[in-house]
């Protein structure tokens, strides 16, 4: 209901399966697709047999979230208005290159709706020119913390 009724996306498909595609493993699940305005899809698996009991707890948005661009501030404000009308928590942050509206969906997944700032392309082009060096510097600065927290073997897989 949330993706259709609140966010206005079209339910494009709901496919129920009794085995894991490409394997002989028997498992019942559903793959649900919602079509976005640009023709792309956001899709979810519904696997109640294997979902952990804390599945619906909000996830840390810094760890993982889905960002979707909207075409205008008016569209962003319309989403915010719709959310406010059903008393759904949301907040807006001006990141300078985009303005973002953040929410958690009913599954606990953080969603971000963004609208580009007028100088978005200029800001992104400037950042692109130094992006590889920024990642290198960040990796060097945080490597020991990550090794301590996750273990060197875990990081070697990334």
Write out the residue ranges for each language-model feature:
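Core segments of cupin and vicinal oxygen chelate
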Residues: 1-41
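Vicinal oxygen chelate
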Residues: 33-37, 54-158
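Short glycine-/small-residue motifs
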Residues: 41-44, 112-113
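Ligand-binding pocket scaffold of soluble enzyme catalytic domains
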Residues: 10-13, 74, 86
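Histidine- and/or cysteine-centered catalytic micro-motif in compact active-site loops
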Residues: 16, 47-49, 71
């Amino acid at each position: 209901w949330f993706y259709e009724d609140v966010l206005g996306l079209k339910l494009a498909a709901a496919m129920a399966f009794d085995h894991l595609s490409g394997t002989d493993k028997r498992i019942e699940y559903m793959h649900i697709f919602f079509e976005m305005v640009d023709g792309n899809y956001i899709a979810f698996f519904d696997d109640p047999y294997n979902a952990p009991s804390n599945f619906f707890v909000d996830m840390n948005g810094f760890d993982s979230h889905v960002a979707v661009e909207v075409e205008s501030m008016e569209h962003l404000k319309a989403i915010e208005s719709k959310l406010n009308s059903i008393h759904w928590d949301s907040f807006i942050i001006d990141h300078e290159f985009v303005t973002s509206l953040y929410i958690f969906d009913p599954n606990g997944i953080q969603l971000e709706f963004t609208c580009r700032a007028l100088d978005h392309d200029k800001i992104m082009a400037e950042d692109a020119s130094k992006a590889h060096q920024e990642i290198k510097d960040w990796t060097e600065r945080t490597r020991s913390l990550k090794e301590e927290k996750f273990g060197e073997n875990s990081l070697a897989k990334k």
